[in-house]
Amino acid sequence: MEESGSGYEGKWEKRWHPLRREWIVYAAHRNNRPWDFDIKEMVHNAPVFDPKCYLCPGNTRVSGEQNPQYPDVFIFENDHPVVGLHSPSISDQEKFSHERFYRREKAEGIAKVVCYDPRHNVTLTDLDTASIAKVFMALREEMIFFRNHPSIKSVLIFENKGEIVGVSNPHPHCQIYATDFVFNVVQKELHAMRLHQEETGRNIFADIIAAEKKDEIRIIAENESAIAFIPFFARFAYETYIFPKKPHQSLITMNDEELAGLADVYRTVTRKFDANFKSVFPYILAFDQAPVDGGDYGG
């Protein structure tokens, strides 16, 4: 049945996601559906120091270790790690069950916590650009360490910000999962990158940036070395990509100036979100990087 002139024209479409190689369904009219979220819940109202916080300077963590009186970035191994270097071994007989339908292996790796700042009541967005860049530089040093670690193949750096996304401790921090395997989402992106290179001879990320700069309307922030935009193929509302303009496999090859540019764009984007929602805007932040297993990933 035709809906010509009914007002439904252009409301549904699917867009190709070049990194995931799958279709993303868009239904623009759903932006008008009711939204009952109470924005007051996102107001940041914590003390500068919380004596019960296991991340604040001088406090004792659950491991019994006491935090130093750190002045800026502080990094330590997670007291409740999701992976470890001394995970129990699994025999060949135990690896498979149900006629080899189910399979398991030991999970090896290193989990760390990165505190951005000693103050309990700030966010990464609240810091000045130089301080954010210092955080990124500390993460770069961690990446270099893991690249040289024989047990590590891939590193996931991520931050969950806001109680609404499941944060149990508001002290400004992110986490690092360095693992002995490469996550599937990274493998999919590497596959897409190689296919694009073979088909066009070009870097897929450079082509994404070029397309967004040509359209212009989805760009949120930009400077000489970095750019942020909501991509044409975004899967979620407000999903934002922050890219260095030059190709890099990871933070490892980015110089201090580029990290400062990345910090500047990050700060601009997150402050705009805070201003738009008149709140401390919650998010999930992930650093999308190539594995550190010695492979050639072409930038």
Where in this protein do the model-derived segments appear?
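Active-site microenvironments that recognize anionic phosphate/pyrophosphate groups
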Residues: M1-H171, Y177-L251, E257, T270-F273, ...
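Acidic, glycine-rich loop-and-strand cores that form catalytic or ligand-binding grooves
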Residues: D264
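Detector for conserved single-position "signature" residues within domains
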Residues: F277
